[in-house]
Swiss-Prot record:
A single GO molecular function term of this UniProt record: isomerase activity
Family from the record: Belongs to the chaperonin (HSP60) family.
Record protein name field: Chaperonin GroEL
InterPro entries documented for this protein: Chaperonin_Cpn60_CS, Cpn60/GroEL, Cpn60/GroEL/TCP-1, GroEL-like_apical_dom_sf, GROEL-like_equatorial_sf, TCP-1-like_intermed_sf
Gene name of the record: groEL
Location of this chain's protein in the cell: Cytoplasm
Enzyme's top EC category: isomerase
Subunit structure: Forms a cylinder of 14 subunits composed of two heptameric rings stacked back-to-back. Interacts with the co-chaperonin GroES.
SUPFAM superfamilies reported for this sequence: GroEL apical domain-like (SSF52029), GroEL equatorial domain-like (SSF48592), GroEL-intermediate domain like (SSF54849)
Key word Ribonucleoprotein present: no
């Protein structure tokens, strides 16, 4: 086992504090509408320019092991805030730095660290309750646009785009962010259910000008196996031909004789048919076939439940108003499934989202909910260069998370004002002893830090503006973008309650642990063994 270095008391805490301050100072320059960018060097490709707190925090690794421990703990604050609300990472870092700095001063002055932590925890619990009391529901598209604008660094176009996307696909719809082709941002909305499988043969195409298959009022046959024998399908094909409707087959695969016969039937105009592979793989494919069945009012023909393709009837087939199949995608528009069954399926998938621990699974389940419940919107981010594209994409992503958080828990006045108002309301809060009272004061003083940092980044005098805001009431605050005082809600400066709450809770949690640290242990750097000496020439080997 490697030898360890051990530091105690003030020596340990001062090293830890240095690390905290290095990381927090790098992150906090990005806060507010006039926050600056940070350039991150990459071992390959061009440097990345970002204004996203958590991206900056993740890049920081310090050489000194003890300083690095402090930095890594604050990095955890930013990471947790990002996971919980998707935004507010810089605010969380600024709060953590303020609590640690004030708290360690109190410890150095002889206060009991455990009582300080209890005081901080007490203040945070009370502050969260006050924040929720101040919170207002994010009712309309205008409020959603304002939240998105603030989170995207005062970019109004981004805010409006997100509000428009939410309006079109609903609050539960999936909104994804992708690289655009041009300089402008675009919004593409896919109505109905779309999955990433295209037609199995180009001979199915009936709209040559668009290269797509478009079928109106079709039957939908869902099969959970490979289909290669046409005899199995004859009863269904005959029934569909008599009904005079088109047919789309969604199966694990359609190949050989079966595919050839379908193509011939289509080209001769006997039956309009198209075949596509079922989306997903394994268990996910089975689940998605079931989703399509519920959406279209059909039944999945599966041998696992004792159903055979030869015995399938028209009653087993799903229906939809229209289906469009391109080379890459299939879109089912207006399935005729029972609304109550669709709702219960959505509720079931939501339950799975709550229970899953995998981010990948959660994302896929959310996509399934959106496909059943509304649709999918894609925001295509435009930029002149790849570096700008990455930076802008990160901002749009943040704004998207912030708007979702706002819809979930409502909004409070932005610009650090909500925390200042909460601190003022809790001025009379008391702990069980004097040390706890100091802990409460540490937390309440730290709640002013985000406002002060926003003002500092705007190049103004923090103390003057902080006092002016503290002397005001309600939503009165300072708009650093326009350099004016006024009602923050009226000026459209809103923060999601969830983002502010998460930032405060995670910051106080980690900062409290750091204040109560008394000893730090780190591995000593390994000393390299000295190199072998040069052998030189071997003696005594003269010529005979």
């Amino acid at each position: 086992m490697a030898a360890k270095e051990v530091k105690f008391g003030n020596e340990a805490r001062s090293k830890m504090l240095e690390g905290v301050n290095i990381l927090a100072d790098a992150v906090k320059v990005t806060l507010g509408p006039k926050g600056r960018n940070v350039v991150l060097d990459k071992s390959f490709g061009a440097p990345t320019i970002t204004k996203d707190g958590v991206s900056v925090a993740r890049e920081i690794e310090l050489e000194d092991k003890f300083m690095n421990m402090g930095a890594q703990m604050v990095k955890e604050v930013a990471s947790k805030a990002n996971d919980a609300a998707g935004d507010g990472t810089t605010t969380a870092t600024v709060l953590a730095q303020a609590i640690v700095n004030e708290g360690l001063k109190a410890v150095a002055a002889g206060m009991n660290p455990m009582d300080l932590k209890r005081g901080i925890d007490k203040a945070v619990v009370a502050a969260v309750a006050e924040l929720q009391a101040l919170s207002q529901p994010c009712a309309d598209n205008n409020a959603i646009a304002q939240v998105g604008t603030i989170s995207a660094n005062s970019d109004e176009k981004v805010g409006k785009l997100i509000a428009e996307a939410m309006d079109k696909v609903g609050r539960d719809g999936v909104i994804t962010v992708e690289d655009g082709q041009g300089l402008d941002d675009e919004l593409a909305v896919v109505e109905g259910m779309q999955f990433d499988r295209g037609y199995l043969s180009p001979y199915f195409v009936n709209k040559p000008e668009t290269g797509a298959v478009e079928l109106d009022d079709p039957f939908i046959l869902l099969v959970d196996k490979k289909v290669s024998n046409i005899r199995e399908m004859l009863p269904v094909l005959e029934g569909v031909a008599k009904a005079g409707k088109p047919l789309i087959i969604v199966a694990e695969d359609v190949e050989g004789e079966a595919l050839a016969t379908l193509v011939v039937n289509t080209m001769r105009g006997i039956v309009k048919v198209a075949a596509v592979k079922a989306p997903g793989f394994g268990d996910r494919r089975k689940a998605m076939l079931q989703d399509i069945a519920i959406l279209t009012g059909g039944t999945v023909i599966s041998e696992e439940v004792g159903m055979e393709l030869e015995k399938a009837t028209l009653e087993d087939l799903g229906r939809a108003k229209r289906i469009v199949i391109t080379k890459e995608n299939t879109t089912i528009i207006d399935g005729v499934g029972d609304a109550s069954l669709i709702e219960s399926r959505v509720a079931q998938i939501r339950q799975q989202i709550e229970e899953t621990s995998s981010d990948y699974d959660r994302e896929k389940l959310q996509e399934r909910v959106a496909k059943l419940a509304g649709g999918v919107a894609v925001i295509k981010v435009g930029a002149a260069t790849e570096v700008e594209m990455k930076e802008k994409k990160a901002r749009v992503d943040d704004a998207l998370h912030a708007t979702r958080a706002a819809v979930e828990e409502g909004v409070v006045a932005g610009g650090g004002v909500a925390l200042v108002r909460v601190a003022a309301k809790l001025a009379g809060l008391r702990g069980d002893n004097e040390d706890q009272n100091v802990g409460i004061k540490v937390a309440l003083r730290a709640m002013e830090a985000p406002l002060r940092q926003i003002v500092i980044n705007a190049g103004e005098e923090a103390s003057v503006i902080a006092n002016a805001v503290k002397n005001g009431e309600g939503n009165f605050g300072y708009n650093a973008y326009t350099e004016q005082y006024g009602d923050m809600l009226a000026m459209g400066i809103l923060d999601p309650t969830k983002v502010t709450r998460s930032a405060l809770q995670f910051a106080s949690s980690i900062a409290g642990l750091m204040i109560t640290t008394e000893c730090m242990i780190s591995e000593l750097p390994k000393k390299d063994a000295p190199a072998m000496p040069d052998m030189g020439g071997m003696g005594g080997m003269g010529m005979m």
